[in-house]
Swiss-Prot record:
ATP binds at K647. One of its GO terms (biological process) is isoleucyl-tRNA aminoacylation. L-isoleucyl-5'-AMP binds at E603. This is Isoleucine--tRNA ligase. It comes from Brucella melitensis biotype 1 (strain ATCC 23456 / CCUG 17765 / NCTC 10094 / 16M). Catalyzes the attachment of isoleucine to tRNA(Ile). As IleRS can inadvertently accommodate and process structurally similar amino acids such as valine, to avoid such errors it has two additional distinct tRNA(Ile)-dependent editing activities. One activity is designated as 'pretransfer' editing and involves the hydrolysis of activated Val-AMP. The other activity is designated 'posttransfer' editing and involves deacylation of mischarged Val-tRNA(Ile). NCBIfam families: ileS (TIGR00392).
Length: 972
C-alpha cells in the first residue's frame, strides 16, 4: 500500500512547464532577435525558400533621407511589413525592397545651413562639390534610418535598397524625362506656379499646405473705357472687383464675369467715408452682392437698371493704375468665366494671369479673340523670384524711387507691396473700400512660409495633349484609376478629383541637388531631339551619376559635333516628385527579384497628391497604365486627445521612446488594432492599453507552451475527438478564413480583434479553463487528455503563425521555445485547414450549450461574491430549462465538466421563485447548490468516490487510476 501521506499531489499533475518568461522584457529581448535574423540572413533564406513561388510585390514609397524616423514612418513601415510577411506566409515570394528619396530642397537647406555657419557662400562653391555634400548627407541618414527600421522588425533587402541618388536610378529618371520629351509631352512655358520666395523655387501641389492668415482685402473700381453708344449709360460708370491680394493689381489684364449672374447698374446716393465713391457715381455689381459691398464702404445706393452679360462682353475697362508709371495705358477686357460666382465679392473677378491658375486659364482661353481685338495676349512677369516687383510692374519695380516694392521677403514676411499699391489706388481715386480678412492661404510645407502665385518660365508636361492614340495623359490616368483597387475606396474618388482638376505638371525646380532636366534648347525653346546626344547623357549618368551634367565641358561632351549649333543647356533640375514617381522603372522593371506593375502601393493619405499621383502620371505618360494594381492609404497619427502632434505642444510620441520603454511589438500591436486608414491616436494611456492587451496575449501563449511541454505528439482520429475539441477545430476553420481574408483585404484590425477575442474569451475563459482538469489530472493514456493536447497544439501553431506578421518578435520567441531546431517562424506557412474540421451543425449546438453555461456561471459568480462558495468546484447547481432545444443540446455532454462544477442537475420542471436568470437567455434558470461528497486532494473536485481505491484514499477514482498509471510508468 502506498503511503499517501508522503505524496505531493501537485507533482503528480501535468502542470504547465516552460522557460518562456511571463515578463516579456521586449526592449532587451527584441534586439537579440534582430541580431539573430541578421546573422542568419533571414531575408535571403526566405528568398531562396520561396524562389519558385509566385511573386507578390509591395513597392516601398521612399521616405526622405533626412532625420530620424517619426511615428508616421513607424506606422507606415509596420503596415508594409505586415503585408509582405503575411503574403510570404501564404505561399508567395513576397519581396520587400526599401527605398529612399534623396534629392531636393530639405537636404540642400541643411548643407546651406552648414555653409552659413562656416561663413561660406553656396554660390561660390562649385556645384558638384555642393552636390557631393548633399549625397553624403543623404547617405548618412539612410544608414541611421536603416537601423531604426530594423529595430521595428522591418524585414527587407536592406543590403540592396534603392535610392533616387544611385547612379543607375539617376540615369533611369533622366531617361524617363527624355521619353516625355521625345513624345512631345514636355514643353517650356510660362505659367503661374506656386513659388516659395524663401526657398527660391516653384512648388508642386504636394509641397503646399494651407494655414489661416489675415490679409488686406480691397474693392477696386475699373472705369468703363472707350467709345460707348450714347444710349448706353454705362459710359462713365465703373465695374468693381474684390481681392485679398492687392499686390496683384499691377498684373491685372482683365475682369471676369459670369453669364449666369444677374448684374445691375447702381448709383451712389450717400457716402460717409472721406475716400471712395462719391454721391452720383455709377457702379456695376452683382445684384446679390451690392448691399453687402456698399455696407462695407458705408454707402447708400439706388438701382438704376439691369446690366446684361451681353453688354458686359462688349465693353472694355481702364486699368485702375492708368496714368501711373507710364505702363498701364492698355484697355482691360471683360471675359466670361465659369469660375466666377456671386457667393462672395462683387460678382466680378480681378483677373491677373500672372498670378492665378484660373486667371491664366481664362486669359489663355480668350487669347486668340483678344489678339484679334488688338489686345496684347502676352502675359507679363510682374514679380521676380526674390519677391520684388520687376519692370513689368511700372511704378513699383526698379523705376520706383527708393527701389522696387516687395511682396514677400527672404524670411517669408509680408513686404511693402500691398501698402504701396493701396496708396496708389487711393491717390488715383480707384479704391472703393478696404478691410482685413482671415482666410486659408498656401504655405510651403518645408519652410512653413507663405507662397505666391507668379508667372515663371518652367518646364511642364501636358495633361491634355493628344498622345497620338486619341488619349491624353489626363484621360489615361482617369481610366486607370477606375481599374485600380483602392483601400479604403474613398481614395479612388479623392485621386480622381485631383487628376480631373489639376493643371499641367510642373517639372522644373531652380535648385542644385537633383536630377537635371537634361535637354538642350534653341532660341525658341525647342528641344533638341537627337538619339546620339541622349545616349551620351544616359551613359554618362549611368557611370558617373547626374553630376556629369554639371561638370565642366558637359555641354560640349554631350552635344559632340552639334556643339557649334547654338543649343543651350538647361540648368533646372527635376521636381523630386518626378524622381519618386519614376522609382517603378529602376526597381520594379530593372530588379530581377521584383515585377512590374507592383501588386500594391501603401502610403499616407497625403500621397493622393504626392507619390500615388506622380507615379500614376509618370507611368501613364510613358507606359499607358499605373505601376500599381492596388493603392492602400493610412491616416495620420494624432495625440491621444485628437490633436496634431508638435514639439511646441510637447505631445509628440516617438517610436524610439516607445521601443525603449515598452518594445517594438507594443507599437506594432497598436498599429494592428487601429483603424489605420483614418487618423489614429497615440499617447501614454493608449500605449498602456496595448501593453495590458499584450500581457494577456503573452500569458495565453505562455500557458500553451507550458501545457505542450507534456505533449508527445500523439494524435486522436477526428471521429474520436470529444465534441469540445471538434468545436475548437471548427473555430480554427472559421478563424482561418477570417485571417486569410483580412490579410487579403488589408483589414488588420479585424484579424487582431478576432484573434485577441478568441484567446481571451474562447480559450482562456472557456476552452482552456474547462480542459485544465483533463490536461493536468487525467492519466497519461486518457483519450480526452491526448485530444486536448492535440487541439492545443493545433491552436498554438495557427495562432502563432497568424500573429507572426503582426508581432514578429514575440511569435519568434514562442516558436523557438516550442521548436528550438526551427529556422524561424517567419519561414513557416499558414497551415491548411482540413475540410472535415468545419461543422456548422456542431457550432450551432454549442451556441446553445454556451448560452445555458453563461446562466450557470452567472449564478456561480454571485455565489462567490457573497462568499457562499470559494470555487465553482464547490457547487453542483440545478439548471431549469424550459426550452427543449436548449436541453436537447446538452444530451451526451458532461455539463458539469463544461461548467467546471463538481456536479450539475438539469430539470425540465418549472424554476422556483428567486432562481437566477439572464435576460438574454430565455427559458433558463439556475438554483446554486453545494456539491456532495468529499474534496479530492489531487483535482480538488468534490465527488462521492473519494477513497474508493484504498491505496489512494484521499483522491477520487479517476485520480487514483491516474496515479496507478503514473506509478507503473515510474513517474510517481
Amino acid at each position: 500500500m502506498t503511503d499517501t501521506t508522503k505524496i505531493d499531489y501537485s507533482k503528480t499533475l501535468y502542470l504547465p512547464q516552460t522557460e518562456f518568461p511571463m515578463r516579456a522584457g521586449l526592449p532587451q529581448r527584441e534586439p537579440l532577435f534582430v541580431q539573430r535574423w541578421e546573422e542568419m540572413n533571414l531575408y535571403k533564406k526566405l528568398r531562396e525558400q520561396a524562389k519558385d513561388r509566385p511573386l507578390y510585390v509591395l513597392h516601398d514609397g521612399p521616405p526622405y533621407a533626412n532625420g530620424n524616423i517619426h511615428i508616421g514612418h513607424a506606422l507606415n513601415k509596420i503596415l508594409k511589413d505586415v503585408i509582405t510577411r503575411s503574403f510570404q506566409m501564404r505561399g508567395y515570394n513576397s519581396n520587400y525592397v526599401p527605398g529612399w528619396d534623396c534629392h531636393g530642397l530639405p537636404i540642400e537647406w541643411k548643407i546651406e545651413e552648414k555653409y552659413r555657419a562656416a561663413g561660406k557662400n553656396k554660390d561660390e562653391v562649385p556645384i558638384n562639390e555642393f552636390r557631393k555634400e548633399c549625397r553624403e548627407f543623404a547617405s548618412n541618414w539612410i544608414r541611421v534610418q536603416t537601423e531604426e527600421f530594423k529595430r521595428l522588425a522591418i524585414l527587407g533587402d536592406f543590403e540592396n535598397p534603392y535610392t533616387t541618388m544611385n547612379f543607375h536610378a539617376e540615369a533611369r529618371i533622366a531617361g524617363e524625362l527624355l521619353k516625355f520629351a521625345a513624345s512631345g509631352q514636355l514643353y517650356r512655358g510660362s505659367k503661374p506656379v506656386m513659388w516659395s520666395v524663401v526657398e527660391r523655387t516653384a512648388l508642386a501641389e504636394a509641397e503646399v499646405e494651407y494655414h489661416d492668415i489675415e490679409s488686406d482685402m480691397i474693392w477696386v473700381k475699373f472705369p468703363v473705357a472707350g467709345e460707348v453708344a450714347t444710349e448706353n449709360d454705362l459710359s462713365g460708370s465703373a465695374v468693381v472687383i474684390w481681392t485679398t491680394t492687392p499686390w496683384t493689381i499691377p498684373g491685372n489684364r482683365a475682369v471676369s464675369y459670369s453669364s449666369r449672374i444677374e448684374y445691375g447698374l447702381f448709383e451712389i446716393t450717400e457716402a460717409e467715408n472721406d475716400f471712395g465713391p462719391r454721391p452720383g457715381e455709377r457702379l456695376v455689381f452683382a445684384d446679390k452682392l451690392v448691399e453687402e459691398c456698399c455696407a462695407k464702404a458705408k454707402l447708400q445706393f439706388k438701382r438704376l437698371r439691369s446690366v446684361s452679360a451681353e453688354e458686359l462682353g462688349k465693353i472694355v475697362l481702364d486699368h485702375p493704375l492708368k496714368g501711373f508709371g507710364g505702363g498701364y495705358e492698355f484697355v482691360v477686357p471683360m471675359l466670361d468665366g465659369d469660375h466666377v460666382t456671386d457667393d462672395a465679392g462683387t460678382g466680378f473677378v480681378h483677373t491677373a494671369p500672372s498670378h492665378g491658375r484660373e486667371d491664366f486659364e481664362a486669359w489663355m482661353d480668350n487669347a486668340r479673340q483678344l489678339e484679334a481685338r488688338g489686345i496684347d495676349p502676352n502675359i507679363p512677369f510682374p514679380v521676380g523670384d526674390d519677391g520684388f516687383y520687376t519692370k513689368d510692374a511700372p511704378g513699383f519695380g526698379p523705376d520706383r524711387e527708393g527701389g522696387p516694392a516687395r511682396v514677400i521677403d527672404d524670411n517669408g514676411k509680408k513686404g511693402d507691396a500691398n501698402k504701396v499699391v493701396i496708396e496708389q489706388l487711393i491717390a488715383a481715386d480707384k479704391l472703393f473700400a478696404r478691410g482685413r480678412l482671415k482666410h486659408s492661404y498656401p504655405h510651403s510645407w518645408r519652410s512653413k512660409k507663405p507662397v505666391i502665385f507668379r508667372n515663371t518660365p518652367q518646364w511642364f508636361v501636358y495633361m491634355d495633349k493628344n498622345l497620338g492614340d486619341g488619349t491624353t495623359l489626363r484621360s489615361r490616368a482617369l481610366k486607370v484609376i477606375d481599374e485600380t483597387r483602392f483601400v479604403p475606396t474613398a481614395g479612388q474618388t479623392r485621386l480622381r478629383s485631383m487628376i480631373e482638376g489639376r493643371p499641367d505638371w510642373v517639372l522644373s525646380r531652380q535648385r542644385a541637388w537633383g536630377v537635371p532636366i537634361c535637354v538642350f534648347v534653341d532660341e525658341e525653346g525647342n528641344i533638341l531631339q537627337d538619339d546620339a546626344v541622349n545616349k551620351r547623357i544616359m551613359d554618362a549618368f549611368e557611370k558617373e551619376g547626374a553630376d556629369a551634367w554639371f561638370a565642366d565641358g558637359a555641354r560640349e561632351r554631350f552635344l559632340g559635333a552639334r556643339a557649334g549649333e547654338g543649343w543651350t543647356q538647361v540648368r533646372d533640375i527635376l521636381d523630386v516628385w518626378f524622381d519618386s514617381g519614376s522609382t517603378h522603372t529602376f526597381t520594379l522593371e530593372d530588379r530581377p527579384d521584383l515585377k512590374w506593375p507592383a501588386d500594391v502601393y501603401l502610403e499616407g493619405s497625403d500621397q493622393h497628391r504626392g507619390w500615388f499621383h506622380s507615379s500614376l502620371l509618370e507611368s501613364c505618360g510613358t507606359r499607358g497604365r499605373a505601376p500599381y494594381n492596388a493603392v492602400v492609404t493610412h491616416g495620420f497619427t494624432m495625440d491621444e486627445h485628437g490633436k496634431k502632434m508638435s514639439k511646441s505642444l510637447g505631445n509628440t510620441v516617438t517610436p524610439q521612446d516607445v521601443i525603449k520603454e515598452s518594445g517594438a511589438d507594443i507599437l506594432r500591436l497598436w498599429v494592428m488594432t487601429t483603424d489605420y486608414w483614418e487618423d489614429q491616436r497615440l499617447g501614454k494611456s493608449i500605449i498602456q492599453t496595448n501593453i495590458d492587451a499584450y500581457r494577456k496575449l503573452r500569458n495565453t501563449i505562455r500557458w500553451m507552451l507550458g501545457t505542450l511541454a507534456h505533449d508527445e505528439g500523439e494524435n486522436v482520429a477526428y471521429a474520436d475527438l470529444p465534441e469540445l475539441e471538434r468545436l475548437m477545430l471548427h473555430r480554427l476553420t472559421e478563424l482561418d478564413e477570417l485571417v486569410r481574408s483580412g490579410y487579403d483585404t488589408f483589414d488588420f484590425k479585424r484579424i487582431a480583434r478576432a484573434l485577441v477575442d478568441f484567446m481571451n474569451v474562447e480559450l482562456s475563459a472557456f476552452y482552456f479553463d474547462i480542459r485544465k482538469d483533463a490536461l493536468y489530472c487525467d492519466a497519461p493514456s486518457s483519450i480526452r487528455r491526448k485530444a486536448a493536447l492535440q487541439t492545443v497544439r493545433e491552436i498554438f501553431v495557427r495562432l502563432t503563425t497568424w500573429l507572426a506578421p503582426m508581432l514578429p518578435f514575440t511569435m519568434e520567441e514562442a516558436w523557438l521555445d516550442r521548436y528550438p531546431q526551427s529556422v524561424s517562424i517567419h519561414a513557416e506557412q499558414f497551415r491548411p485547414t482540413p475540410a472535415e474540421w468545419r461543422d456548422d451543425v456542431l457550432a450551432e449546438k454549442w451556441r446553445k450549450v454556451r448560452a445555458v453555461r453563461r446562466v450557470v456561471t452567472g449564478a456561480l459568480e454571485l455565489e462567490r461574491a457573497d462568499k457562499r462558495i470559494g470555487s465553482s468546484l464547490e457547487a453542483a447547481p440545478v439548471v431549469y430549462i424550459a426550452d427543449k432545444s436548449l436541453s436537447d443540446s446538452l444530451e451526451g455532454l458532461d455539463f458539469a465538466e463544461i461548467c467546471i462544477t463538481s456536479g450539475i442537475s438539469v430539470s425540465d420542471a418549472a424554476a422556483p421563485e428567486g432562481a437566477f436568470t439572464l435576460g438574454d437567455v430565455k427559458g433558463v434558470a439556475v438554483v446554486p447548490e453545494r456539491a456532495k461528497g468529499e474534496k479530492c486532494a489531487r483535482s480538488w473536485r468534490y465527488t462521492t468516490d473519494v477513497g474508493a481505491d484504498p491505496e489512494f484514499p484521499e483522491v477520487s477514482a479517476r485520480d487514483a487510476a491516474a496515479l496507478r498509471e503514473l506509478q507503473a510508468l515510474g513517474k510517481l
